């Protein structure tokens, strides 16, 4: 999967069609990817409505892997948009989830921010010219930044939500 910050979005038949402005390189091997097709993904937006997304599926002929192109307001493997996560973390009363879910979201974000900051520090050591200024971001911008970095460098694992939430695999 790849997170894109610059994308075109238009609605057709109630489905938001998301298309990245630039085709990103493969996060696994760095090869050039080709568009293979589209898939559907549903996410709850900040008003609590279910929003259908049509996402591009990209194929890397070099490593023979498929990747979905996600907009930066979608968190991988989560059904709520990033804005709901940020509102729950900031404890505003505008979020559309119950208090128990909001508490779980706050714990997940706290752990994810720690993991994202560690990933960025490691990248900064490997690439000293990397510019990082995420301390000045709002919660939503910081969340989008960390999700984009962690996913695009290949550090996001499908079990990351279990690892980050402190649940053991045993």
Regions found by a protein language model. Give the residues of each.
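Short, positively charged, Gly/Tyr-enriched micro-motifs
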Residues: 64-151, 165-168
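Short metal-coordination and nucleic-acid-contact micro-motifs, chiefly zinc-binding Cys/His arrays
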Residues: 18-25, 53-57
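Acidic/histidine-rich catalytic cores and adjacent linkers
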Residues: 57, 158, 165-170
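Short cysteine-rich clusters marking metal-coordination/redox-active sites
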Residues: 26-29, 60-63
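Short recognition patches in nucleic-acid-associated and regulatory proteins
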Residues: 30-52
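A structured, charge-rich N-terminal accessory region that forms the first stable segment of a protein
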Residues: 5-7
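Short, intrinsically disordered, charge-biased short linear motifs at domain edges
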Residues: 9-17, 44-51
């Amino acid at each position: 999967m790849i997170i894109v910050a610059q994308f075109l979005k238009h609605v057709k038949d109630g489905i938001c069609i998301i298309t990245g402005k630039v085709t990103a390189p493969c996060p696994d091997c760095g090869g050039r990817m080709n568009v293979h097709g589209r898939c559907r993904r549903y996410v709850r937006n900040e008003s609590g409505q279910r929003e259908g997304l049509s996402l591009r599926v990209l194929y890397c002929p070099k490593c023979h892997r498929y990747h979905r192109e996600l907009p930066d307001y979608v968190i991988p493997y989560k059904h709520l948009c990033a804005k709901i996560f940020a509102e729950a973390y900031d404890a505003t009363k505008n979020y559309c989830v119950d208090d128990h879910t909001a508490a779980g979201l706050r714990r997940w974000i706290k752990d994810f921010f720690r993991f994202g900051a560690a990933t960025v520090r490691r990248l900064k050591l490997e690439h000293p010219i990397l510019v990082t200024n995420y301390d000045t971001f709002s919660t939503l911008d910081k969340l989008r930044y960390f999700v984009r970095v962690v996913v695009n460098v290949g550090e996001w694992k499908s079990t990351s939500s279990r690892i980050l939430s402190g649940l053991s695999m045993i």
